[in-house]
Amino acid sequence: MMAKLMITVMMVLLLSLQQGADGRSERWRKNQMAASRIMRNLITARGDPPRFCVHKICYEDSECNQWCTGGCNPTQGKCDTA
């Protein structure tokens, strides 16, 4: 786990150091956005985004992850966001 985190941090640092010269500014900007998104996810330790809740089949609320704020929808048998 620590090695994976270190690799991710190194990747983010490399993306952050890339220069936006010679017509590469758009790619550099996209890399900056990706790097900041990765760091934000690492800092907040987020799991799956909410869009994956509707695909998870469940029988009780405890089977749904933290993003499925609606818990288990008994009529559909799937996790729900609200």
From Swiss-Prot:
<feature type="modified residue" description="4-hydroxyproline">
    <location>
        <position position="50"/>
    </location>
</feature>
<dbReference type="GO" id="GO:0090729">
    <property type="term" value="F:toxin activity"/>
</dbReference>
<feature type="propeptide">
    <location>
        <begin position="24"/>
        <end position="46"/>
    </location>
</feature>
<comment type="similarity">
    <text>Belongs to the Pg turripeptide superfamily.</text>
</comment>
<feature type="modified residue" description="4-hydroxyproline">
    <location>
        <position position="49"/>
    </location>
</feature>
<keyword id="KW-0379">Hydroxylation</keyword>
<feature type="disulfide bond">
    <location>
        <begin position="58"/>
        <end position="72"/>
    </location>
</feature>
<keyword id="KW-0732">Signal</keyword>
<feature type="disulfide bond">
    <location>
        <begin position="64"/>
        <end position="79"/>
    </location>
</feature>
<dbReference type="GO" id="GO:0005576">
    <property type="term" value="C:extracellular region"/>
</dbReference>
<keyword id="KW-1015">Disulfide bond</keyword>
<dbReference type="InterPro" id="IPR026210">
    <property type="entry name" value="Toxin_Pg"/>
</dbReference>
<protein>
    <recommendedName>
        <fullName>Turripeptide Gdm9.1</fullName>
    </recommendedName>
</protein>
<keyword id="KW-0301">Gamma-carboxyglutamic acid</keyword>
<feature type="modified residue" description="4-carboxyglutamate">
    <location>
        <position position="63"/>
    </location>
</feature>
<feature type="signal peptide">
    <location>
        <begin position="1"/>
        <end position="23"/>
    </location>
</feature>
<keyword id="KW-0964">Secreted</keyword>
<keyword id="KW-0800">Toxin</keyword>
<feature type="modified residue" description="4-carboxyglutamate">
    <location>
        <position position="60"/>
    </location>
</feature>
<feature type="disulfide bond">
    <location>
        <begin position="53"/>
        <end position="68"/>
    </location>
</feature>
